Structure formats: C-alpha cells, structure tokens
A protein has these predicted regions:
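Conserved non-catalytic scaffold segment of RNase H-like nuclease domains
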Residues: 1-97
C-alpha cells in the first residue's frame, strides 16, 4: 500500500478554526498537494500567524477547502495516510473519512 504524508497549518487550535495550508507528499518527498487555503469564516489569526507566518493577505487568492476537496480525496484514496499531529490535523479534513 502506498503511503502519503500530510501536514496542515491552521487559523488556530480550536475546533472552529480552519486550514490555511495543506501539504501532502509521497514517499519520495514529491508534493502531491501543496497549497495555501482561503478560510471561509476566519479573517484574521494573529496568534497562529506568529507561529506559521501565513497571513490573511497570503491566502486572499487561494482556493477554499471546498474547491480542493475532490483533489484531496483523489490523492489519499486507497493510500495509508500518515499525519503529523494526527489527532489535531485530521479534524480539519473530513475528506480523509473516504481514504481507505
């Protein structure tokens, strides 16, 4: 079974926060998805911005998660998904429910 590796950056650590960046790479380190994401509801995230450096200006023209949802599903379908900080990151990715 192929393995992909996933990491996110978010607007914060609460359940109502959103992704601002998603990276999925393969075993060779090749990026399969590497994109900024424009949040639907959050317009600023100063605390998280201090951690990851991604500002609202950086994501103003980025796709929303809804727009890349099918791409995420295609990349993870049938693959083992290794997630950095899985308990946290997976709550931002309902697309993973269909992965196996």
């Amino acid at each position: 079974m192929e393995t992909v590796y996933l990491d996110t950056e978010t607007t914060g650590v609460s359940d109502d926060d959103e992704m601002v960046e998603l990276t999925i790479i393969d075993d060779d380190g090749k990026p399969l998805i590497n994109t900024l994401i424009k949040p639907k509801y959050h317009t600023s995230w100063p605390g998280a911005q201090r951690v990851h450096g991604i500002s609202p200006i950086d994501v103003r023209h980025a796709p929303t998660q809804d727009r890349i949802s099918n791409d995420i599903r295609k990349v993870v379908k049938g693959k083992r998904v290794v997630i950095y900080n899985a308990p946290f990151d997976s709550k931002f990715l309902p697309e993973l429910e269909d992965a196996a």
